[in-house]
UniProtKB/Swiss-Prot annotation:
Its main location: cytoplasm. The keyword RNA-binding applies. It is found in: Cytoplasm. Keywords: Activator, Cytoplasm, Repressor, RNA-binding, Translation regulation. Gene3D superfamilies: Translational regulator CsrA (2.60.40.4380). InterPro entries: CsrA (IPR003751), CsrA_sf (IPR036107). GO terms for cellular component: cytosol. NCBIfam families: csrA, PRK01712.1. It holds the Pfam family CsrA. Controls extracellular enzymes, N-(3-oxohexanoyl)-L-homoserine lactone, and pathogenicity. Repressor of virulence factors. A key translational regulator that binds mRNA to regulate translation initiation and/or mRNA stability. Mediates global changes in gene expression, shifting from rapid growth to stress survival by linking envelope stress, the stringent response and the catabolite repression systems. Usually binds in the 5'-UTR; binding at or near the Shine-Dalgarno sequence prevents ribosome-binding, repressing translation, binding elsewhere in the 5'-UTR can activate translation and/or stabilize the mRNA. Its function is antagonized by small RNA(s). This is Translational regulator CsrA.
Amino acid sequence: MLILTRRVGETLIIGDEVTVTVLGVKGNQVRIGVNAPKEVSVHREEIYQRIQAEKSQPTSY
């Protein structure tokens, strides 16, 4: 795992098209902004896990 330190307003770049910017820090919460192409899905981890769980459940008709 790569660990980086960023201050509010600073950005990191992932690949050629994804940027992640630190928008604010309040207590133990960090607000981040993600710019990515429409074809790149961006989810919070808990939402992604829920999507994956729903995909693995058999569909009933």
